[in-house]
Curated annotation (Swiss-Prot):
A lipid is attached at residue 2 (N-myristoyl glycine). It holds the Pfam family Snf7. This is Charged multivesicular body protein 6. The modification Phosphoserine is found at residue 119. The gene is Chmp6. Belongs to the SNF7 family. Probable core component of the endosomal sorting required for transport complex III (ESCRT-III). ESCRT-III components are thought to multimerize to form a flat lattice on the perimeter membrane of the endosome. Several assembly forms of ESCRT-III may exist that interact and act sequentially. Interacts with VPS4A; the interaction is direct. Interacts with VPS4B; the interaction is direct. Interacts with CHMP4A, CHMP4B and CHMP4C. Interacts with SNF8, VPS25 and VPS36.
Amino acid sequence: MGNLFGRKKQSRVTEQDRAILQLKQQRDKLRQYQKRVTQQLERERALARQLLRDGRKERAKLLLKKKRYREQLLDRTENQISSLEAMVQSIEFTQIEMKVMEGLQVGNECLNKMHQVMSIEEVERILDETQEAVEYQRQIDELLAGNFTQEDEDAILEELNAITQEQMELPEVPSEPLPDRNPEAPAKARSRQAELVAAS
């Protein structure tokens, strides 16, 4: 029982996942650094203006040199962020390619197993047997069709002519509508029937 609950689950996090996470964390740290430096640059620019207004030109020049150096750092930081993002995208795309390759490998193995079960020789054998069965059935059909004697053929033709003659002898259906039934006719038939019963 203790083994059931004490066993560690196998982690689903791969080395690639860890690498991507680290790269993204580095990228985020660089962006935070970028934001801090940008804010410092704005403050230094405002301070340089104030120094110029106060007549402290050398101090303002020194501050602007410092600002220029930080701007270069910002450019390098931007390049590093771009490199990190490119690396993340490359790893993610490689993961997709690996999944595709795994899928292709599984599909290939499946096809190979199917081909082992159904070899070309087996397919040819089945097709030959099917062709033989079709040919055999055709021969049976020919024998059955050819088994009729002249007497049988004459009897078949005679029966066909008789059916055709019966259809020709049937009366034609009238094209005009039938007359309405007379309501008095059934009453007369009943009274006639009553007379016959009384007479007997």
